[in-house]
Amino acid sequence: MRRLAAACAVALAATVTACSSPKPAVSPNPTRYLGVAGVSMAGLRGFERVTGVRPGIVEIYTTFGDPLKSALLTAIIRGGAKPLVQLEPYHISMSAIAAGRYDAYLRRYAAGLSRLTHQVLLSFAPEANGYWYSWGCRSTSASVFVAAWRHVHDIIAHYDRRIIWLWDVNQSFPRSCAITARWPGGGYVDWVGVDGYLWYPYLTFNMVFASTIVNLRVSTGKPVLIAETGVLNMPKAAAQLKSIFAGAKAIPGVIGVVYSNYATAQHDYRLEKDPSALATFRQEARDYATR
């Protein structure tokens, strides 16, 4: 997540209850993916150059209401990667989405997706178990969130049934809300995404992610993508990167890691700022990723 990440993971409080929909099952490629988030096409080329890795997933962020970034998505596809689109409803009422007030927009968006030559991963309203977004659990009820998520899914899926639907949450932490109530249902989700960052030198992959992933795997049965992660330019950054890849390989059902190679006003996750971390990432990513 780009605004806030928690420091430690805790177990989920309850089992997620699956529900059904008319959506047919999608069979995504089971390849282990290495991805990058938050970069322009020029930034993507730079990432490939310094890491020696061609990402299998490229994650972009879009605001609900904005036109589909067709040219960017086409460029990502032509480069051999799957686009992961984070569709974020800033300043939009989730109740209004659920009630159909934005259906015309969703139909235009879906029509654009259907014209692409390759399957896209799509995440709507990520990290709803956090409190920092208007669609999060302190501002939007679980029932409204689920209704909006399903409505977005149903409108878009009518036009493009190739989409891999990613339900993306923040790693559970003491101030987060229970994930369980915001689960849209197994018929609406193909992959589960988990976001989390190793903000402090003592943190490891298992401390941040393990309990959340294990509980989501048990409760949903869906493949898990580490949809955002990163380390800061600190003395233990290289060791933390090793921890990320080792942890992702060790937990069954984790199918990929997306690294946030960008800087925010508060945090800088760019690998090129730390030669030791960059060298470690180059080696670990090559060992991890297959295409």
Ranges and model annotations:
Residues R32, Q119-P126, A227-R291:
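Substrate-binding cleft of secreted/luminal carbohydrate-active enzymes
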Residues Y33-L116, K236-Q240, G247-I251, S260, ...:
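N-terminal carbohydrate-binding/catalytic regions of secreted carbohydrate-active enzymes
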Residues R54-T63, I179-N206, S260-Y262:
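Aromatic- and acid-rich polysaccharide-binding/catalytic face
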Residues V16-A18:
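C-terminal motif of bacterial Sec signal peptides marking the signal peptidase cleavage site
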Residues A71-Q86, W191-P235:
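Glycoside hydrolase catalytic-domain groove-lining segments
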Residues Y109-A142, I163-V169:
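Active-site groove signature of glycoside hydrolases
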Residues W149, H153-C177, G221-P235, Y259:
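Aromatic-lined carbohydrate-recognition surfaces of secreted/lumenal glycan-active proteins
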Residues A98-L121, S143-Y159, A181, K249:
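An active-site-proximal structural segment forming one wall of the substrate-binding cleft
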